[in-house]
Amino acid sequence: MTQPIARSIPLQVVSGDTAAPASLQTGVKQIGGDKINRSPVQFVDAPVLRKPSWIRVRIPSGNAVQNLKAKLRENRLVTVCEEASCPNIHECFSHGTATFMILGEVCTRRCSFCDVAHGRPKPPDASEPTSLATTVADMGLKYVVVTSVDRDDLRDGGAQHFVDCISAIRASAPKTRIEILTPDFRGKGRMDRALEILATSPPDVFNHNIETVPDLYPNVRPGADYQWSLTLLQRFKAQHPTIATKSGIMLGLGETMEQVQATLRDLRAHDVDMITIGQYLQPTPHHHPVMRYWTPEEYKALEDYGNALGFSHVASGPMVRSSYHADRQAAGAGVAA
């Protein structure tokens, strides 16, 4: 059996700068240290763990990646694959698949694990749904994932823009199955408004990531709430019993096996059908450090545990990401393509 690497490392968390942050200009991206330095928590004196042999990404040859990037730029579209520095980008792009990120490239949150830029976003682009639908149809995609940055500046959290994109894709590519990976729509009345809007044109799969165990939320997802995310998933399922719900969790942020298992139980108790479990990788030295690399055997144990809980599909492995092989995950859960 593969031995675990560095079961834990010391981590000192300190409060961020208490001085009032400089005002942000609309559309300006804050990335890396500029973003994390505005976070309410900072990480200091954390040693860097060496990546184990099972954390490896094969870079395929050929022009498929550049061709797809050119098509995206031509239509002024953004993928979370690029913005979040996903390690699977070359594999997915080489197969002509991508997870499209709508509502801009600037997020209103400052999560310590995420490489997407922070700042004050621009207003939604009214032409984006049409551009997205045209690209999906041109690529002949059978399955598409649509996600977004957090848009706490919008009254509905961006729900109407999601619906506009779903409707446009269905008009241009009626056979394409659509998965949406949404933010939490947190805020007074925002979840109610978002769910009401999404009901007008629901997706084939509704995905919202829980990301980590509840005890780590203050350091990993400042601005989010564990129970709020569970409630969002449960309420969508209650409104749409026949639509698959999905969530994802990262490992390596300091959680224990028992905490992960408890989170899986919580997700099933809130009627989540599908789950993805993968290794967190630090995007830059400024982000939350990797506390531990979980072994392939542990991922297999969690897969078995999730299956025993009754998830319709469990994708568990070091390089698994929420939208990685999403079409295969959906097919495994009975969502026809």
From Swiss-Prot:
Disulphide bonds annotated for this chain are none
- Spell out the Gene3D superfamilies in the cross-references: Aldolase class I
Q: Where in the cell is it found?
A: Cytoplasm
- What gene, per UniProt, encodes this protein? lipA
Tell me, what's a Pfam family for it?
A: Radical_SAM
Establish whether keyword Cytoplasm is in the entry. yes
UniProt lists the family membership as follows:
Belongs to the radical SAM superfamily. Lipoyl synthase family.
Q: What is the lineage of its organism?
A: Bacteria, Pseudomonadati, Pseudomonadota, Gammaproteobacteria, Lysobacterales
* Entry EC number(s): 2.8.1.8
Where is it mainly found? cytoplasm
GO MF entries: 4 iron, 4 sulfur cluster binding; lipoate synthase activity; metal ion binding
Name listed for the protein in its UniProt record:
Lipoyl synthase
Keyword Chaperone appears in the UniProt entry: no
SMART domains recorded? Elp3 (SM00729)
